[in-house]
Amino acid sequence: MGEPEEVMPGSGAVFTFGKTQFAENIPSKFWFRNDVPTFLSCGDEHTAVVTGNNKLYMFGSNNWGQLGLGSKSTVSKPTCVKALKPEKVKFAACGRNHTLVSTEGGKVYAAGGNNEGQLGLGDTEERSTFHLISFFTSQRKIKQLSAGSNTSAALTEDGELFMWGDNSEGQIGLENVTNVCVPQQVTVGKPISWISCGYYHSAFVTTEGQLYTFGEPECGKLGLPNQLLVNHRMPQPVPGIPGKVVQVACGGGHTVVLTEKAVYTFGLGQFGQLGLGTFLFETSVPKAIEHIKDQKISFIACGENHTALITDMGLMYTFGDGRHGKLGLGLENSTNQFIPTLCSNFLRFIVQLVSCGGCHTLVFATPRLGGTEEMELKEINKSCFSAATSLSLSNLSSGIVLHQTLSARVRRREREKSPDSFQMTRTLPPIDGIPMPPVCFSPSPIPFYMAASNWSGKMTPEKEGLTQPEPDYFRDNMAKGKETDNSSATDSESLGETTDVLNMTHMMSLNSNDKSLKLSPIDKQKKQETIEKLKQHTAHFGNDDSKGCASEEMSKTVKEGKAYKQLLAKGIYMTQAAMTMEAFSDEDIGNDSGQPGPRADTHAEGVQRKIFSCESKHGLYPPDFKAIAKESDGGQSQKDPEAEETVSEKENELAEMAGLQARRQSEENLRNINMFFDDLPNRDVNIEDEESKDFVKDSRRNKQDVIFDSERESIEEPDSYLEGESESQQGTTDGFEQPESVEFSSGEKEDDDEVETDQNLWYSRKFIEQGHKEETEHILSKFMAKYDFKCDHLSEIPEEQEGAEDSEGSGIEEQEVEANENVEVPAGKEEKEIEILSDDLTDRAEDHEFSEDEEPEDMAEELDEDLESKKNVPADVASDNSLKKDETTKQEKRAICEYNENPKGNMHYHAKSSSSEVLNDSESTPNKDVKKSKKIFLFKRMSLMSQKSMQSNNEPLPEIKPIGDQIAFKGNKKDANQNHMGQNHQDTSPPDMERRSKSCTIL
């Protein structure tokens, strides 16, 4: 389909869809030189093609020898059955695991499975080559062959019907036998014109146009009233079908009937194979398909769970189970269709033949000459706008109406078919992540547009793969998906120069992702409570995974430099946090306070941060920051690819400019922030604390990821965000709240749940990550500002508030780090350091959880007083929340002033004093608060620590003997102190990044 029309011969080609062995799950086509197909038949997993030269070609599964090629090996290419070359093959019929072939001379051959005698050879031994059924002679000319699960049928031109094989459900019309190994005639006293065998039921049409059915009676597939089902083993006429029946087709659990004027269906339609819409899943009463009532149908075909129709104009409609793309609707659409859907790919072709199997479809079509455009417009309009008519209330009058079981995907399909689809998709985005207009995501002003559009663009070619792969596939290929998807997504998003960086980032972040995946178990255990709360804000999709993966490695590294890192985390966090806060305090606060909750839903980190901002908005941010919020909103709202590009570049410039302005603004911001946090209610702080934990998770993951690239981290976070978004959309469609859906999408759940929406995760990650990229950079500045004020506040602000801010800060921190990482961070060192820091943080968080009061003291003993004071400050800060707002305000002011004068020494000293104060308070405060705040604080610190500890605590580093690459941080002590987030990255990062972090921290 993707190749130009000229490549195909004028005689046409055979198109394959679904799992055909010829091209797994990928639409493909083939044709014969100097020959054309005249008959197609699809079995459960194998296919037969008869050509005009009376040759038989077979391919597909062959575990029972059903291809008749003399072996049982799978054949992926159409292969001529040479044994039948002397015979002129006319018809073929493929069952579940056997094949029937008839010749012009009236002979019938069979091959394959024979456990029920379906080969008609008088025994039940399977055959791997075609054997002649002696019952049929040249006296009987075969008109039609049909094969079911384990049944066979042959209809002669004289109207005689012969059936054999399995009769456990009466599917061969014999009353008192379970199976027969030789053909038996089935008659109702009238000549028969058409026969069809389903999996466990059969139907035929008499020359008078009367339909008879027999076999398995469940699900209404026989179309008979209950009183007639007693005799289901014998052919009985089906009432309720007006007009003369021309054809009948039996599927796995449904039956399709073609009359001279309409198409009727009955039976089971849970996949949409009845074509009666999403409100009727089962009916025993034949119902006309209203959607194609204006079309003249010339041929019908049924697979196990899908149906195909050919019109007299050579157009094809398909509906039912869309898995593997067997409906032929394109790579981007492998979803179930509940009403006949026009195969637009065949508008330029005339469909001649179609056959449906268990998991695939074959179509023979010839190029359409002229009139293609007019027909295209005409048919598309009809198919697009007549969908609603098929859902008329008349369909609800009878049958089983299943509203609750209606899947979100189904509802989405319904909406896609109706004119209101776009409005509905706004509130209920598609589950599968099928590309939808950006309009559907309009509710979220964050770079969602870009992510959505790019996502759709990327998803279109790869979506099918996504839907098909199993959950593990996503996990295994997460890194690869992020690399390729992110790089391609960045290209599509017009990130420009950042594209290469993103690619590098993805390469680098593959390891971090794996590690992060390892980390999740520890963090999950520690933060189960937080996660539960986060479910509402579920923006940490990647965080849990990253934590889980890194947890194992972290536990090891944590043991080595646990105390050191903890102290560093606190001290560094204190110092760098204040510095960072100074630079970005305005933007950070503005974004947090200004961003609405809905936005938070759009991005993973954005969700958390935004949620914080919404909650903290009331208490955390005063009106003075509204302008800042607007600015930050504007910055983040730049979701377009260009916006992101410019944002990322601007972020670098802003970071540098922030250095100059940071000092002035940071001082004012710090003061304002101090006032803010003093005024902040504990409730907001608590909420933020838990969220901050989540952010800490994010920051931890970001730390690991930071090594690779800040952009990548931002991308990963957007990933989770997209994931959340798509899942939230799914959840909404399913009736769940977006937060829940987001949570499911967060982590591997989505991937586990669902395969189809699971690759969406990658794509969504790409786009979201890109979207986050901008936010991350914006947030970097914000985060820097927050941390600048936070460092001062760490000692002064209550732990809960601090933790809340830290959580926000950590989110920002992560983004900051990501931005800094974007600059150019040695993946190896930063990775290791970040991992170690994150590991230490997790361990520290655990230690803090168990003994926070003791831990500050122990840490103080182990490390320098500065580190000790810092460490104590975080733990104490949690307890200080309400008690020491005044003290924190004063101390923060002092700390800010001192820090501005001498960031390292003063900050550490101030941290000590504040930590001592906080320690007193923390001892009085409950362990839970301290634990939460410490956890959050530790993780954030770790991110800050990894950078700050390397930076501000340069002296203690040699004493502590930094683990792995931590020593590398020594080189950039100044930079580290200046930019706790960015330093780890800055050590390897270009001077620009150093400037950014420095400008932010130099305050």
From Swiss-Prot:
- Which SUPFAM superfamilies would you find in this protein's record? RCC1/BLIP-II (SSF50985)
Q: Where in the cell is it found?
A: Golgi apparatus; Cell projection, Cilium; Cytoplasm, Cytoskeleton, Cilium basal body; Cytoplasm, Cytoskeleton, Microtubule organizing center, Centrosome
Residues bearing Cysteine methyl ester?
C1000
One function term, GO molecular function aspect: guanyl-nucleotide exchange factor activity
Concerning InterPro entries, the annotation shows:
RCC1/BLIP-II, Reg_chr_condens, Signaling_Regulatory_Domain
GO biological process terms, alphabetically, are: cilium assembly; eye photoreceptor cell development; intraciliary transport; positive regulation of autophagy; protein localization to non-motile cilium; visual perception
The residues bearing each RCC1 repeat, given as ranges, are: 54-105, 106-158, 159-208, 209-261, 262-313, 314-367
How is the polypeptide modified once translated? Prenylated.
Q: What is its main location?
A: Golgi
This protein's GO CC annotations: centrosome; ciliary basal body; cilium; Golgi apparatus; photoreceptor connecting cilium; sperm flagellum
Q: Where is the composition biased (Acidic residues)?
A: 716-726, 797-821, 849-867
- Which Pfam families does its entry note? RCC1, WD40_RLD
Q: Covalent lipidation (S-geranylgeranyl cysteine) residues?
A: C1000
- Bias kind Basic and acidic residues: ranges: 472-485, 693-715, 827-848, 882-896
Q: Sorted alphabetically, which keywords does the UniProt record give?
A: Cell projection, Cilium, Cilium biogenesis/degradation, Cytoplasm, Cytoskeleton, Flagellum, Golgi apparatus, Guanine-nucleotide releasing factor, Lipoprotein, Methylation, Phosphoprotein, Prenylation, Repeat, Retinitis pigmentosa, Sensory transduction, Vision
Composition bias, Polar residues: 486-495, 978-989
How this chain assembles, per its entry, is: Interacts with PDE6D. Interacts with RPGRIP1. Interacts with RPGRIP1L. PDE6D, RPGRIP1 and RPGRIP1L may compete for the same binding sites. Interacts with NPM1. Interacts with SMC1A and SMC3. Interacts with CEP290. Interacts with WHRN. Interacts with SPATA7. Interacts with RAB37 and RAB8A (in GDP-bound forms); functions as GEF for RAB37 and RAB8A.
- Please describe what this protein does: Acts as a guanine-nucleotide releasing factor (GEF) for RAB8A and RAB37 by promoting the conversion of inactive RAB-GDP to the active form RAB-GTP. GEF activity towards RAB8A may facilitate ciliary trafficking by modulating ciliary intracellular localization of RAB8A. GEF activity towards RAB37 maintains autophagic homeostasis and retinal function. Involved in photoreceptor integrity. May control cilia formation by regulating actin stress filaments and cell contractility. May be involved in microtubule organization and regulation of transport in primary cilia.
Q: Per its record, how is this protein called by name? A: X-linked retinitis pigmentosa GTPase regulator
Q: Which gene encodes it?
A: RPGR
